[in-house]
From Swiss-Prot:
Residues 31-115 are annotated as: Disordered. The lineage of its organism: Eukaryota, Metazoa, Chordata, Craniata, Vertebrata. GO terms for biological process: D-xylose metabolic process. One of its GO terms (molecular function) is D-xylulose reductase activity. Keywords: Carbohydrate metabolism, Metal-binding, NAD, Oxidoreductase, Xylose metabolism, Zinc. It catalyses: xylitol + NAD(+) = D-xylulose + NADH + H(+). The keyword NAD applies. Activated by calcium and inhibited by zinc. Its EC number is 1.1.1.9. This is D-xylulose reductase. Belongs to the zinc-containing alcohol dehydrogenase family. It comes from Sus scrofa (Pig). Residues 50-59 have a biased composition (Basic and acidic residues).
Length: 134
């Protein structure tokens, strides 16, 4: 039929959010075209109204908990102090083994349980085959 979802919109399923990946492109005339989706788990802190603010992939790629609208930092975390080398915007008050140097950016296996960035699950939807008469 038509597009599965409009660009930028999110499909929310129980226990998670389903969203178009950044690299989403489509050629509706090509029968082999597949559309990739990224899914991220919902955290208990998000309400229905906060879903679209908090679960976009680029937010997970660049963790910036302080900038999430309508959210407060989870218990045990505080904003990074200016001048600290290699810190994120939310740092554990007590350091854990292997947490000393955490680089911001790409999917890292962090120890923030509710904000675990990995793994990323890809959902693929295959569009209907093109009409042979076209």
């Amino acid at each position: 039929x038509x597009k599965l979802v409009e660009s930028g919109x999110x499909l929310v399923q129980p226990g998670g959010s389903l969203r178009l990946s950044k690299x989403y492109t489509e050629n509706v005339n090509h029968p082999a075209t597949t559309t990739x989706y990224k899914x991220q788990p919902m955290t208990p802190d998000f309400t229905e109204x906060q879903t679209h603010e908090g679960t976009h992939q680029d937010v997970f790629d660049q963790p910036n908990l302080x900038x999430w609208k309508g959210n407060t930092l989870p218990e045990g975390y505080e904003p990074a102090k200016x001048g600290e080398x290699g810190t994120q915007d939310a740092n554990p008050k007590x350091x854990q083994d292997g947490d000393e140097x955490t680089x911001t950016g790409x999917x890292q296996x962090d120890k923030i349980g509710r904000y675990n960035l990995x793994p990323t699950i890809f959902f693929e939807a295959t569009p209907p085959k093109a009409n042979e008469n076209q």
